[in-house]
């Protein structure tokens, strides 16, 4: 086994020979990261990515300046989907070490699950992985129900069934109930709804290769809310929360749904399909109907929903939408506390009417006359939230996955958003 490379932190600038803007230097003892107080966590994460790029796969975080957040920043940059890495962690107090261990267990689960090939992770596998993770941290405080295939159609989950019926792998709805009170009549505090499209070809509105090659990650919203619930439980969540994952493949076959099809939902809404690649909102609608029926204080849905959100924010921020200004402010405050990037985008009443159809109440995609695609997608979802003006947050997960490495991240999933949602649930 190779000897670990020591990584230490310093608030002193690097020797001038390393350059005026050097953020790290090397000596006989190892590598020194030079913190300047401006963005220390970002500096540590970027340095970790560089250290990994040097081929250094065994490190020891050394010295007294490391805390849980700094250790975590290092790991976020150091972790990558290929190869193995070993970190010898510094001595931390019990609370910080427990926090770090929980992040490593749960957020790494989120990243690894999103990175899994679609051949390995179908709708049923995603639902079962979610059950296993939550059960691991919640024990007997959790119950769940899995509904799949024709049972979905018979029970009226027409959006999820319609999207998923084109695949040989049956669509699946996971309904999970975390109830720490033990009282079956206890009110539900929050519902989390996740888009779990385990591969998205676009259907008959087929994607080009350049847009399809990362679509194993189209279940990023489901993984994120699952991780958020698990992480909130490790932080002492003592309120009842229900999780709904809407899992399916969106593929082409003789049984796949087609443009012009009309879906009738359990709340009476009829939706004309004019783009089979706008499938995420069709499956989320079923989950949001179930969530609304619980009468919770809070509904949060998360989905890799639109390219428009990525166009606006890149992969650097998650997009946040809500009619509830106070609740949006609470989410953004949680994001600030957890050092995770969220940005609120517009959502107004008029966005709800920008999905006209000649044959149904709603179209599943906006026309060229209404180009605000991320906002109209959120407007579409609002039609399936009973009290959409209060207590509902929609997260378009544009920061979930990176197709190529950048200075802070390897290629693949980031795990961003888990801590923010967990923070809000436990605030």
Curated annotation (Swiss-Prot):
InterPro entries attached to this UniProt entry: Leucine_aapep/pepB, M17_PepB-like_N, Pept_M17_PepB, Peptidase_M17_C
Main subcellular localisation: cytoplasm
Binding site for Mn(2+) 2: 195, 200, 218, 279
Comment on bound cofactor: Binds 2 manganese ions per subunit.
Keyword Cytoplasm: yes
Keywords: Aminopeptidase, Cytoplasm, Hydrolase, Manganese, Metal-binding, Protease
UniProt cross-references to HAMAP family, sorted A to Z: Aminopeptidase_M17
Free-text function comment from the UniProt entry: Probably plays an important role in intracellular peptide degradation.
NCBIfam families listed in its UniProt record: PRK05015.1
Protein name: Peptidase B
Source organism: Shigella dysenteriae serotype 1 (strain Sd197)
């Amino acid at each position: 086994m190779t000897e670990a490379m020591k990584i230490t932190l310093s608030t002193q600038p690097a020797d001038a020979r390393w350059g005026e803007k050097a953020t790290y230097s090397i000596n006989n003892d190892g590598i020194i990261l030079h913190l300047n107080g401006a963005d220390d966590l970002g500096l540590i994460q970027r340095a970790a990515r560089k250290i990994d790029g040097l081929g250094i796969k065994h490190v020891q975080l050394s010295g007294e300046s490391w805390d849980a957040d700094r250790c975590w920043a290092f790991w976020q940059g150091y972790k990558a989907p290929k190869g193995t890495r070993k970190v010898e962690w510094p001595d931390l107090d019990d609370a910080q070490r427990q926090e770090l261990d929980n992040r490593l267990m749960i957020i790494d689960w989120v990243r690894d699950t999103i990175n899994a090939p679609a051949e390995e992770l179908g709708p049923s596998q995603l639902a079962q992985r979610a059950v296993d993770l939550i059960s691991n941290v919640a024990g007997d405080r959790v119950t769940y129900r899995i509904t799949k295939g024709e049972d979905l159609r018979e029970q009226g989950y027409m959006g999820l069934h319609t999207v998923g019926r084109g695949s040989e792998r049956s669509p699946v709805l996971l309904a999970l109930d975390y109830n720490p009170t033990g009282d079956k009549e206890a009110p539900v505090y929050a519902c989390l709804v996740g888009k779990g499209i385990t591969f998205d070809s676009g259907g008959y509105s087929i994607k080009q290769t350049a847009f399809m090659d990362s679509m194993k990650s189209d279940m990023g919203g489901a993984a994120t809310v699952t991780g958020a619930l698990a992480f909130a439980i490790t932080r002492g969540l003592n309120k009842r929360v229900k999780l709904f994952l809407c899992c399916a493949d969106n593929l082409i076959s003789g049984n796949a749904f087609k443009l012009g099809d009309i879906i009738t939902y359990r709340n009476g809404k009829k939706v004309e399909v004019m783009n089979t690649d706008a499938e995420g909102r069709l499956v989320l609608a079923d989950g949001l109907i179930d969530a609304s029926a619980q009468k919770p204080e809070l509904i949060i849905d998360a989905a890799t929903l639109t390219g428009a959100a990525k166009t606006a924010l890149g992969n650097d921020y998650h997009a946040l939408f809500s009619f509830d200004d106070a609740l949006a402010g609470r989410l953004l405050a949680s994001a600030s506390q957890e050092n995770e990037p969220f940005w609120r985008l517009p959502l107004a009443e008029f966005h709800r009417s920008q999905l006209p159809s000649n044959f149904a109440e709603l179209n599943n995609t906006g026309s060229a006359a209404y180009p605000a695609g991320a906002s109209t997608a959120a407007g579409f979802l609002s039609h399936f939230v009973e009290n959409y003006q209060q207590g509902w947050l929609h997260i378009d997960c544009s920061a979930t996955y990176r197709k190529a490495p950048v200075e802070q991240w390897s290629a693949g999933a980031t795990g961003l958003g888990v801590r923010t949602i967990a923070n809000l649930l436990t605030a």
